[in-house]
Amino acid sequence: MARILGIDIPNQKRIEIALTYIFGIGLSRSQAILKQANINPDKRVKDLTEEEFVAIRNVASAYKIEGDLRREIALNIKHLSEIGAWRGLRHRKNLPVRGQRTRTNARTRKGPRKTVANKKIESK
Protein backbone atom coordinates (compact mmCIF):
# COMPACT_ATOMS: atom_id res chain seq x y z
CA MET A 1 0.00 0.00 0.00
CA ALA A 2 1.33 3.39 -0.99
CA ARG A 3 0.59 6.47 1.10
CA ILE A 4 -0.55 9.78 -0.36
CA LEU A 5 -1.53 12.59 2.01
CA GLY A 6 -1.66 10.16 4.94
CA ILE A 7 -4.05 7.73 3.22
CA ASP A 8 -3.16 4.19 2.15
CA ILE A 9 -4.06 3.58 -1.46
CA PRO A 10 -3.99 0.11 -3.11
CA ASN A 11 -0.90 -0.80 -5.14
CA GLN A 12 -2.56 -2.97 -7.78
CA LYS A 13 -5.11 -0.41 -9.02
CA ARG A 14 -4.68 2.28 -11.66
CA ILE A 15 -3.67 5.59 -10.07
CA GLU A 16 -6.83 7.23 -11.47
CA ILE A 17 -8.99 4.82 -9.43
CA ALA A 18 -6.67 4.59 -6.41
CA LEU A 19 -6.87 8.35 -5.78
CA THR A 20 -10.64 8.03 -5.28
CA TYR A 21 -9.92 6.19 -2.00
CA ILE A 22 -9.15 9.64 -0.55
CA PHE A 23 -12.25 11.35 0.89
CA GLY A 24 -13.04 14.37 -1.26
CA ILE A 25 -11.46 13.05 -4.45
CA GLY A 26 -13.81 11.44 -6.96
CA LEU A 27 -13.08 10.22 -10.45
CA SER A 28 -13.25 13.61 -12.18
CA ARG A 29 -11.07 15.34 -9.57
CA SER A 30 -8.60 12.47 -9.72
CA GLN A 31 -8.39 12.88 -13.50
CA ALA A 32 -7.84 16.64 -13.07
CA ILE A 33 -5.05 16.05 -10.52
CA LEU A 34 -3.28 13.59 -12.83
CA LYS A 35 -3.62 15.95 -15.79
CA GLN A 36 -2.06 18.82 -13.80
CA ALA A 37 0.74 16.52 -12.58
CA ASN A 38 1.34 15.18 -16.13
CA ILE A 39 0.89 11.54 -15.11
CA ASN A 40 -0.68 8.82 -17.26
CA PRO A 41 -3.97 7.78 -15.54
CA ASP A 42 -3.53 4.17 -16.75
CA LYS A 43 -0.33 3.73 -14.75
CA ARG A 44 -0.50 1.40 -11.72
CA VAL A 45 0.32 2.75 -8.26
CA LYS A 46 3.18 0.25 -7.83
CA ASP A 47 4.83 1.63 -11.01
CA LEU A 48 4.89 5.28 -9.89
CA THR A 49 8.21 6.94 -9.11
CA GLU A 50 8.86 9.08 -6.04
CA GLU A 51 8.83 12.25 -8.21
CA GLU A 52 5.35 11.36 -9.46
CA PHE A 53 4.14 10.83 -5.88
CA VAL A 54 5.51 14.26 -4.96
CA ALA A 55 3.79 15.84 -7.98
CA ILE A 56 0.46 14.25 -6.99
CA ARG A 57 0.90 15.42 -3.38
CA ASN A 58 1.63 18.99 -4.47
CA VAL A 59 -1.41 19.20 -6.75
CA ALA A 60 -3.79 17.40 -4.35
CA SER A 61 -2.76 19.55 -1.37
CA ALA A 62 -4.45 22.54 -3.07
CA TYR A 63 -7.84 20.84 -2.61
CA LYS A 64 -9.79 20.52 0.62
CA ILE A 65 -9.77 16.78 1.37
CA GLU A 66 -10.05 14.27 4.22
CA GLY A 67 -10.14 15.88 7.69
CA ASP A 68 -10.47 19.48 6.49
CA LEU A 69 -13.41 18.60 4.24
CA ARG A 70 -15.13 16.52 6.95
CA ARG A 71 -14.69 19.41 9.41
CA GLU A 72 -16.13 21.94 6.94
CA ILE A 73 -19.17 19.74 6.25
CA ALA A 74 -19.79 19.28 9.99
CA LEU A 75 -19.49 23.04 10.58
CA ASN A 76 -21.91 23.78 7.72
CA ILE A 77 -24.49 21.42 9.22
CA LYS A 78 -23.93 22.89 12.69
CA HIS A 79 -24.41 26.41 11.27
CA LEU A 80 -27.71 25.43 9.62
CA SER A 81 -28.87 24.01 12.92
CA GLU A 82 -27.83 27.09 14.93
CA ILE A 83 -29.58 29.62 12.69
CA GLY A 84 -32.80 27.62 12.90
CA ALA A 85 -32.98 26.72 9.23
CA TRP A 86 -35.36 24.01 8.06
CA ARG A 87 -32.44 21.94 6.78
CA GLY A 88 -30.75 22.21 10.18
CA LEU A 89 -33.91 20.97 11.89
CA ARG A 90 -34.12 17.99 9.51
CA HIS A 91 -30.46 17.17 10.19
CA ARG A 92 -31.08 17.29 13.95
CA LYS A 93 -34.08 14.96 13.67
CA ASN A 94 -32.20 12.58 11.33
CA LEU A 95 -34.82 12.93 8.60
CA PRO A 96 -34.39 13.50 4.84
CA VAL A 97 -33.27 17.08 4.20
CA ARG A 98 -34.23 17.62 0.57
CA GLY A 99 -37.99 17.29 0.62
CA GLN A 100 -38.42 13.55 0.16
CA ARG A 101 -41.54 11.87 1.51
CA THR A 102 -41.31 10.24 4.93
CA ARG A 103 -44.72 8.63 5.46
CA THR A 104 -43.33 5.62 3.64
CA ASN A 105 -39.71 5.10 2.61
CA ALA A 106 -36.79 7.08 4.13
CA ARG A 107 -35.83 3.90 6.01
CA THR A 108 -32.10 4.49 5.61
CA ARG A 109 -32.29 7.84 7.33
CA LYS A 110 -34.93 6.91 9.94
CA GLY A 111 -33.50 3.50 10.85
CA PRO A 112 -35.39 0.24 11.32
CA ARG A 113 -39.17 0.34 11.82
CA LYS A 114 -40.48 0.90 15.31
CA THR A 115 -43.76 -0.98 15.40
CA VAL A 116 -46.62 0.39 17.46
CA ALA A 117 -49.29 -1.97 18.84
CA ASN A 118 -52.91 -1.27 17.84
CA LYS A 119 -55.39 -0.14 20.49
CA LYS A 120 -57.98 -2.80 21.30
CA ILE A 121 -61.61 -1.84 20.70
CA GLU A 122 -63.82 -2.49 23.71
CA SER A 123 -66.83 -4.71 23.00
CA LYS A 124 -70.23 -3.66 24.37
Swiss-Prot record:
Residues 94-117 have a biased composition (Basic residues). It comes from the Bacteria. Keywords: Ribonucleoprotein, Ribosomal protein, RNA-binding, rRNA-binding, tRNA-binding. GO terms for biological process: translation. One of its GO terms (molecular function) is rRNA binding. PANTHER family: 30S RIBOSOMAL PROTEIN S13/40S RIBOSOMAL PROTEIN S18, SMALL RIBOSOMAL SUBUNIT PROTEIN US13M. Located at the top of the head of the 30S subunit, it contacts several helices of the 16S rRNA. In the 70S ribosome it contacts the 23S rRNA (bridge B1a) and protein L5 of the 50S subunit (bridge B1b), connecting the 2 subunits; these bridges are implicated in subunit movement. Contacts the tRNAs in the A and P-sites. HAMAP family: Ribosomal_uS13. Belongs to the universal ribosomal protein uS13 family. Part of the 30S ribosomal subunit. Forms a loose heterodimer with protein S19. Forms two bridges to the 50S subunit in the 70S ribosome. This is Small ribosomal subunit protein uS13. It comes from Mycoplasma pneumoniae (strain ATCC 29342 / M129 / Subtype 1) (Mycoplasmoides pneumoniae).
